[in-house]
A protein has these predicted regions:
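Acidic/glycine-enriched connector segments
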Residues: 2-3, 8-138
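N-terminal intrinsically disordered, low-complexity tails enriched in polar/charged
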Residues: 1-4, 142, 156
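Positively charged, lysine/arginine-rich intrinsically disordered segments
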Residues: 133, 155-156
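Intrinsically disordered, low-complexity segments enriched in serine/proline and basic residues
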Residues: 140-154
Length: 156
């Protein structure tokens, strides 16, 4: 049984791509998604049609004291959703580009070492698996590398 995340931009227009993905999944897959319009609702509907289980994450909007807490609750929901997944499919729209909650979900998947496949609307797909995204500055692990080198040299 695999937990497959299906997330995406509200402005993503290729409903068939989302539905084709859901249809292609093994029967024991569980779709993990949110209740957002577009990609998430299409995935949920197609999962129901194909008798696949769907786990829908919604933000906890109870006990909110100010409107500034609302985005935090949505990002918390996104974290919980991604943490539940074994693999994430993220759909990026041409119009909206790489932004918002979908961007956060992809970055969080990378951070937590959950493999992700990015479906760019009208372009080729990209699989991201435990590596830096191209827009991140490359991290230098110089101190760790030197420490490892010297500890091995001293061991001889």
């Amino acid at each position: 049984m695999n937990f497959i995340g299906v997330v995406g931009a509200r402005k993503f227009n290729d409903r068939k791509a989302v539905e084709d993905l859901v249809v292609s999944l093994p029967k024991d897959s569980i779709i993990v998604t949110s209740g957002c319009k577009g990609v998430c609702t299409w995935a949920k509907a197609k999962a129901a049609e194909k008798d696949l289980e769907a786990l829908v994450f919604s933000p906890d909007l109870s006990n909110i004291r100010s409107r500034f807490e609302i985005p935090k609750r949505y990002y918390q929901r996104n974290c919980e959703l991604i943490e539940k997944c074994d693999f994430v499919h993220a759909f990026i729209s041409k119009e909206g580009g790489y932004s918002g909650g979908t961007r956060f979900e992809i970055e969080y998947a990378v951070k937590t070492r959950i493999p992700a496949k990015v479906h760019w609307e009208g372009r080729m797909d990209e699989i991201i698996y435990q590596r830096q995204l191209p827009f991140y500055p490359e991290k230098q692990f110089c101190a760790a590398a030197w420490q490892n080198f010297f500890s091995q040299a001293v061991a001889f």
